A protein has these predicted regions:
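Short, glycine-/Ser/Thr-/acidic-enriched flexible segments
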Residues: 37, 177, 232-233, 248-250, ...
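Structural signal for conserved beta-strand scaffold positions within catalytic alpha/beta enzyme cores
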Residues: 91, 137-139, 228, 358, ...
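N-terminal "arm"/small-domain region of PLP-dependent enzymes with the aminotransferase-like
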Residues: 1-71, 442
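Charge-dense polyanion-binding interfaces
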Residues: 470-489
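Short glycine-rich or small-residue beta-strand-to-loop segments that form or flank ligand, phosphate
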Residues: 63, 90-92, 170-173, 331, ...
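Conserved N-terminal alpha-helix of the aminotransferase class I/II PLP-enzyme fold
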Residues: 53-98
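Conserved PLP-enzyme active-site core in the AAT-like
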Residues: 5, 9, 15-20, 24, ...
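Conserved C-terminal alpha-helix-loop-beta "cap" of PLP-dependent enzymes
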Residues: 298-474
């Protein structure tokens, strides 16, 4: 693109173009998938449309192979790397969960230490269960008013690196679900000075690569790997993601790690959506996210004018634990109207037909992205104003803290695979948990394998259940019982 920052022709979408060419060839399918371009499953075709099922095809020479790309998929990955300023990019069809796990499995082996905040997505801890690495937690500060965890302070990271000089990597959220950013450039430098990799969970930061006035992206900050949820703010289909790597990471080894866990039947619907969405962002991303940021700022002003709500933004920035803030994130504190965030979340859907991203103990998040319009913002603002009028209470008995510092007893892998027993929830106090417990979204564990179960945590779990949070993780779907390490206090 002439006059742009890109080196390659970002008007090109090789997977999409190859699929269009293949469609015109009218090839007779004697391969999988068995619906045979939709003919074998007319109900599915009626639901999804012929154009969709017609390109739900298998890997073949004209369309390349995700496990070992040599033509159109490889081209698409090179274009993605160019668009995002990375040395290499990998198309991921197992969502950013797969991307995050690949980062950790690439950096760590059994017994290695990795420095990370505790408010990470469960995919990070899942990877520790798989590879046997040992977490060194940097417990984030908590904003006392909002009850949310913030970023990692520079001095906390520096201390962790000094105390654990053999750690192999530092992992950073860029940003958190709420839009909070740590000082990524400084953390990258500290990690590299100590001979460690810096990994970024950038599930909520796709737009950082294309928007002006937004926090620094992981690749621009010099991080070694970043997991980017293109489907969240980039416009691709759900479950599609990108894994980005810097120049000091061996791309061939990363591909081998990916192929340990990712499907051998990569969806061309997902891959083509990544290809088309990358092209769209390269061509129009800066304009799009400028508009998104403007909408979010307008919504913040309007919501704060209602009274009783606090739509927080850049005023949280303190130069350290909140080094920067993603202004596209529309996070709203609700406790001052006497309602938990999850209660407002449910009311918006059930009473006003508005589905927001999530509600937690004290906040809601409305996720704004490339598909939002001003009229939807007005509808959300009006609904919040009416909720305050109809449902406001005195708020007695509401919890306010979203984050509880963990008491780590043993590694996630050791605890997950250890002998265990199932106990009624209230009888687990003081025991060591051997499974995950979390509200989803956001998917940040309240408890992880290897952590001690405290009365405070049990109170939180029961409160979150009572308020209607979607609780996931344990074997018992009702979370009346938990698995704990047998014979271990």
């Amino acid at each position: 693109m002439k006059g742009s920052r890109f080196k390659l022709n970002q008007n090109h979408a090789p997977i999409h173009e190859a699929l269009e060419t293949f469609r015109r060839m009218r090839v007779v399918p004697f391969d999988v998938p068995g619906h045979k371009r939709g003919r074998g499953n007319p109900e599915l075709t009626e639901f999804l449309g012929q154009k969709c099922v017609g390109v739900d095809v298998n890997s073949m020479k004209p369309l390349d192979n995700l496990c070992h790309p040599v033509s159109v998929i490889r081209e698409a990955e090179e274009l993605a790397a160019d668009a995002f300023g990375a040395a290499h990019a990998f198309l991921m069809v197992g969502c950013t969960t797969s991307s995050v796990q690949t980062m950790v499995l690439t950096a760590c082996k059994r017994g290695d230490e990795i420095i990370l905040p505790r408010n990470v997505h469960r995919s990070v801890l899942n990877a520790l269960v798989l590879c046997g690495a040992i977490p060194v937690y940097v417990n984030p500060e908590v904003d006392q008013r909002l009850g949310i965890s913030l970023g990692m302070r520079r001095e906390q990271v520096e201390k962790a690196i000094k105390e654990h000089p053999k750690a192999v990597a530092v992992l950073v959220n860029n940003p958190t679900y709420y839009g909070i950013c740590s000082d990524l450039r400084a953390i990258v430098k500290m990690a590299h000075d100590a001979g460690m990799l810096c990994l970024a969970d950038e599930a909520h930061g796709t737009h950082f690569y294309f928007g002006g006035g937004l926090p620094v992206s992981a690749m621009a900050a010099g991080a070694d790997m970043a997991s980017v949820s293109m489907h969240k703010s980039g416009g691709s289909l759900t479950q599609s993601s990108l894994l980005l790597t810097g120049p000091n990471v061996h791309a061939g080894y990363v591909r081998q790690i990916i192929n340990l866990t990712q499907t051998t039947s990569g969806s061309y619907l997902l891959m083509s959506s990544l290809d088309i969405s990358r092209r769209n962002l390269a061509q129009r991303g800066r304009q799009i996210f400028h508009q998104v940021a403007d909408m979010a700022e307008y919504a913040r002003e309007e919501i704060n004018a209602i009274g009783g709500y606090y739509a927080f933004g850049k005023e949280l920035v303190n130069g350290n634990s909140v080094f920067d803030f993603d202004i596209t994130k529309l996070s709203v504190h609700t406790l001052d109207i006497g309602l938990a965030g999850i209660e407002v979340y449910d009311i918006l859907r059930d009473e006003y037909d508005i589905q927001i991203e999530f509600g937690d103990i004290g906040n809601i998040l409305a996720y704004l992205s490339i598909g939002d319009r001003a009229q939807e913002i007005e509808r959300l603002v009006s609904a919040l104003a009416e909720i305050r009028r109809r449902f406001q209470t005195d708020g007695s008995g509401l919890l306010s803290q979203e984050y509880i510092d963990p008491q780590v007893v043993t590694s996630p892998q050791e605890a997950f695979y250890a002998d265990k027993c199932s106990l009624p929830l209230r009888e687990t106090e003081g025991k060591v948990c051997s499974e995950f417990v979390m509200c989803y979204p956001p998917g940040i564990p309240i408890l992880a394998p290897g952590e001690r179960i405290t009365a405070e945590i049990l109170d939180y779990i029961e409160y979150a259940k009572a308020k209607g949070c979607n609780m996931t993780g344990p074997e018992d779907p009702d979370i009346l019982r938990l698995n704990v390490l047998a014979g271990r206090e």
